[in-house]
Amino acid sequence: ARKMRNYVKAVRAVEVDGVKAATPAPIVLAGHGPKLMQVAADLADGLFLYLQPTAQVAAARKLLGPHKQIHAVVRTVRATDAATARRVARAALGFYLQLPAYHRAWAAAGFTPADYADGGSDRLIDTVAPWGSPAQLKAVIQSYFDAGASHVSLYPIHPDDDYQPGKAGGLLWDWPTLEALAPAA
């Protein structure tokens, strides 16, 4: 966190040659641990959260106050069958279930080491990769706004993607889910 604190201060101090923007570009830090969240509260314009439950969003909002940005990236599975949805989510989240930094963040939301074992507990999977019909997923999205997110980005998990152990992401976008959840024009 000390390095990030120094980095943000250095970025803020940069003098740009040439035309200056009317408003400086915001600095939004990615981090879900307490130290980086504190740096975001102290020095940044916002915080970027990934795979975090609404409880973490609410905690971040309390820490950052009402005016800073909170971007929540939510992995979703458009499926109404629990077994199918969880199988798809587990394939996509396998990489993150191994990372101690995520374990610590999820522990702050009430999860235990048993929740990270064997592909993740149903409770953890359902929380960090919500699944359901488009109507159910819209309610989940709203719950992130209600918890304090200023922006919610959907990252739907494609059921046919070939997630590889040890790799962070898949290559296929689930366009039908994005279209089903898009606001009406």
What are these regions (language model features)?
Residues 1-185:
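Active-site-adjacent structural elements that line small-molecule/cofactor binding pockets in enzymes
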